[in-house]
């Protein structure tokens, strides 16, 4: 019997659907000695609850990292590849090497560690739920910062997602530097379709 400690790393991304901003990924190794109550898929939590849990995760996890791929990278390699690259970057930055990586969804990044995709993993696996919370809060924070740079797009409100409000502002002001030019609504505004 092996004495090797099993270290599960949960990985998830945030921001595949928005028309603007980076896609974020987080990798989290939770400490079994410090369980964090209330972990759940970030999409089911209020912003306030996500922010509180993100602080707890950062304080109590054995290791955590957050990485991203820019809108420009998304346009160059497509959103799936950019999501996987952000995940790989997050895993590569870990200070502790996990024994297994569990990823939300079907696709796993190309890494040397055994990895498994779990559909709806953010609602089934605590480590993935923790990663989903860190990725979502980091991305939301970035979009609030982008709101300060580009107030005419109201990014703090819709976080770059293709809401009717965002689409109207996009049509009114055109695309800015952080809009994803490979996405159909942005292409339409730029006259590329």
From Swiss-Prot:
Keyword DNA repair: no
Main location: cytoplasm
Annotated keywords: Cytoplasm, Endonuclease, Hydrolase, Manganese, Metal-binding, Nuclease
Short name of one Pfam family: RNase_HII
GO biological process: DNA replication, removal of RNA primer; mismatch repair
Chain ranges of the RNase H type-2 domain: 6-193
Cofactor(s) needed by this chain: Mn(2+); Mg(2+)
Documented EC number(s): 3.1.26.4
Similarity field: Belongs to the RNase HII family.
Subcellular location: Cytoplasm
GO cellular component: cytoplasm; ribonuclease H2 complex
GO molecular function: manganese ion binding; RNA binding; RNA-DNA hybrid ribonuclease activity
Binding-site list for a divalent metal cation: 12-13, 104
Family matches, as PROSITE patterns: RNASE_H_2
InterPro entries, per the entry: RNase_HII, RNase_HII/HIII, RNase_HII/HIII_dom, RNaseH-like_sf, RNaseH_sf
Protein name: Ribonuclease HII
Reactions that this protein is recorded to catalyse: Endonucleolytic cleavage to 5'-phosphomonoester
Annotated function: Endonuclease that specifically degrades the RNA of RNA-DNA hybrids.
Domain of life of the native organism: Bacteria
Family annotation (CDD domains): RNase_HII_bacteria_HII_like
NCBIfam families attached to this UniProt entry: PRK00015.1-1, PRK00015.1-3, PRK00015.1-4
């Amino acid at each position: 019997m092996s004495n090797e400690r099993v270290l599960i790393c949960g990985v998830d991304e945030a921001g595949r659907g928005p028309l603007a901003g980076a896609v974020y990924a987080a990798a989290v190794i939770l400490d079994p000695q410090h369980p964090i109550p209330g972990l759940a898929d970030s999409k089911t939590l209020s912003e306030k609850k996500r922010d509180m849990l993100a602080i707890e995760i950062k304080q109590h996890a054995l290791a955590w990292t957050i990485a991203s791929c820019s809108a420009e990278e998304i346009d160059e390699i497509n959103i799936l590849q950019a999501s996987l690259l952000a995940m790989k970057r997050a895993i590569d930055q870990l200070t502790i090497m996990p024994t297994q990586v569990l990823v939300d969804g079907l696709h796993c990044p190309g890494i040397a560690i055994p990895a498994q995709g779990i559909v709806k993993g953010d609602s089934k696996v605590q480590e993935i739920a923790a990663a989903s919370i860190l990725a979502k809060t980091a991305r939301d924070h970035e979009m609030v910062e982008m709101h300060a740079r580009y107030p005419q797009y109201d990014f703090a409100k819709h976080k770059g997602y293709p809401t009717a409000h965002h689409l109207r502002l996009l049509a009114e002001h055109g695309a800015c530097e952080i809009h994803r030019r490979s996405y159909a609504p942005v292409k339409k505004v730029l006259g590329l379709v």
